[in-house]
Amino acid sequence: IMTIHLISFASLLHKQATLRSSHEAILSELEKYYTVKLVDYQDMDKLTSDDFKIIFIATGGVERLVIQHFERLPRPAILLADGMQNSLAAALEISTWLRGRGMKSEILHGELPAIIQRVHILYNNFRAQRSLFGKRIGVIGTPSSWLVASNVDYLLAKRRWGIEYIDIPLERIYEHFQQITDEQVGASCAAVASQALACREGTPEDLIKAMRLYRAIKKVCEEEKLEALTLSCFKLIEQIDTTGCLALSLLNDDGIMAGCEGDLQSIFTLLAVKSLTGKDGFMANPSMINSRTNELILAHCTIGLKQTERYIIRNHFETEKGIAIQGLLPTGDVTIIKCGGECLDEYYLSLMHISEPTRPY
């Protein structure tokens, strides 16, 4: 069962024994879903970063006490105030002070079902954020030169999210690629080809090369214990005359989040979304926007085969080489999201409805 630690701030004028009885309604409701532990503010340093913490404003008159412990407060500062003992007024004062110093703050107050629903969301967010800690993202090669606004500061990203970007030279991939024979990937190629709706471009030789590349990258993922990777695919084409599209598609099917162009922000987005929702996404380029009809056309080449209803084997759009995947998606509602900023502290999010699953180029 999930545990919530309520860091309690109460005025000395109120007896500790009455703390529970004064807030019986909210505490009993929380205990239906969580193990609730009341922690005196003086003991909050005993809690770890894996403990989910809420600041419990139990009474009024604690404003100065809370701000004296500003450095030790959990972030973001979630303040629970049920309104009893003048707690809401105190929470509003504290929240205003915190926000004035650039600290994110939220007050949980109102009807009990609404508070519980919000706690569920916050707990899920916390758990997703903790699951990112220690995750390793492989940067195979270097980001494409045209990604001028997609940089990530490795140190700031690690400090903020606990993730590690690991630079891996393309030479590691080339070495494994040369060691994998055509015979080793023959059966896998036959399986991918037989399940395709059609094969518009690409030769059997192209498919074999693309599958050898998949095996080579998978090997490096295992060696480096990667949860995700981004691949400098255009540099790769110059060296081994194949594209990474199929490899990245199959890696996504394997549960290893994979993106192209060495895009550091997009691969973090895929990893964060998987941690939060448990669902896979895929990278895509906005190809055309019609603001009058509110339509967006997205181009893709690395979608996981499992995410499609059917797929068509194509070649790589820009170079007309290798193998790429044209996925036919089910119609319905989806979310488009992009995390950005050098320390990954910004995001764009929008709901979208897929009305036309595929449009051939």
Describe the function of each predicted region.
Residues T3-L92, R99-G100, E111, Q117-N124, ...:
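Metallocofactor- and cofactor-centric catalytic cores in central/energy metabolism, strongly enriched
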Residues Q16, E63, S87, S145-L147, ...:
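Flexible loop/turn segments at secondary-structure boundaries
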Residues N86-A128, S275-I303:
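Short, glycine-/small-residue-rich phosphate/pyrophosphate-handling segment
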Residues R127-L156, R160, E295-H316:
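Conserved anion/nucleotide-ligand pocket segment
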Residues I168, K225, S232, K279-P286:
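Flexible, glycine/charged-enriched surface loops at secondary-structure junctions
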Residues A198-L276:
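Long, internal scaffold/assembly segments composed of regular secondary structure
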Residues G255-L351:
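C-terminal catalytic subdomain
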Residues M352-Y361:
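Single conserved hydrophobic/aromatic residue that forms the stacking wall/gate
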